[in-house]
UniProtKB/Swiss-Prot annotation:
Binds 1 zinc ion per subunit. It is a multi-pass membrane protein. It comes from Proteus mirabilis (strain HI4320). The gene is htpX. Its cofactor is Zn(2+). It comes from the Bacteria. It is found in: Cell inner membrane. This is Protease HtpX.
Length: 292
């Protein structure tokens, strides 16, 4: 709760400063205030709705089945492993699901630490040893224990808010600059220019802003790897990452990649990857950089 309050206060403070600066430049105060409210509602609203629906959407997108009553030795082992690790980190046991996919992968999601979901692919259970699978599960449990889902949502909300706010402000300047006298009576100038410029800028700034969220996602992956190493041992986590190097390209939806153990490696720039390269993750574990 404190984390949410700090993020919201920081966002409001920065937006307040922006409002003062823009008011000094001559933009109508009511226009700025309304835009700040609208940007905040849309920016945070979309992020939080996605978070609240994350378990349902994740299960639906991969066709996952929550294990209610285990029917096999593998399912019993999976539940026992998640239960034991949850107790170790002090969280309520997440729901556990299995989904049919050939790639070696797993993910965690949920709106709260004590109302989360951990899902693993059939490819992971078939291809990994128990030690390797245990390390992957510990990685996902670490995501839950660290509150990474909520933190990523808050960061996305802040980023969304600023993308909307700054895009609309610049669009307002441009529209007013090229508008006729009659159109200038409208606080946003020419409405077609305003909407066109704001849409283009939101796309451009959205792409640039994703660099921030992807950097944070990569940073949290190192910490989740370290959390797994603390739970089950460094060598098990290294072995799991080495196994991932031989796996299929992940098939999960892009929106879920941030909390999968295995991310996509095909990108024209590492800046837009949700996961660090596997070799860097292995090296970080060996050096103990995030284990301190």
């Amino acid at each position: 709760m404190m984390r949410i309050a700090l993020f919201l206060l920081t966002n409001l403070a920065v937006m307040f400063v922006f409002g003062i600066i823009l008011s000094l430049t001559g933009i109508q105060g009511r226009s700025v205030q309304g835009l700040m409210i609208m940007a905040g509602l849309f920016g945070f609203g979309g992020a939080f709705v996605s978070l609240l629906m994350s378990k349902w959407m994740a299960l639906r997108s991969v066709g996952g089945q929550v294990i209610e009553n285990p029917t096999s030795e593998v399912e019993r082992w999976l539940l026992d492993t998640v239960r034991r690790q949850s107790e170790q980190v002090g969280i309520k046991m997440p729901q556990v699901a299995i989904y049919d996919a050939p790639d070696i992968n797993a993910f965690a999601t949920g709106a709260r630490r004590d109302a989360s979901l951990v899902a693993v692919s059939t490819g992971l259970l078939a291809s990994m040893s128990r030690d390797e699978a245990e390390a992957v599960i510990a990685h996902e449990i670490s995501h839950v224990a660290n509150g990474d889902m909520v933190t990523m949502t808050l960061l996305q909300g802040v980023v969304n808010t600023f993308v909307i706010f700054i895009s609309r402000i610049i669009a307002q300047f441009v529209a007013n600059f090229i508008s006729s006298d009659e159109e200038s009576e409208n606080s946003n100038g020419n409405p077609w220019v305003y909407m066109g410029v704001s849409m283009v800028l939101e796309i451009v700034f959205g792409i640039l802003a994703s660099i921030i969220t992807m950097w944070f996602s990569r940073y949290r992956e190192f910490h989740a790897d370290a959390g797994s190493a603390k739970l089950v041992g460094r060598e098990k986590m290294i072995a799991a990452l080495q196994r991932l190097k031989t796996s299929y390209e992940p098939q999960e939806e892009s929106s879920m990649m941030a909390f999968c153990i295995n991310g996509r490696n095909k990108s024209f720039s590492e800046l837009f990857l949700s996961h660090p390269p596997l070799d860097k993750r292995i090296e970080a574990l060996r050096s103990g950089e995030y284990l301190k």
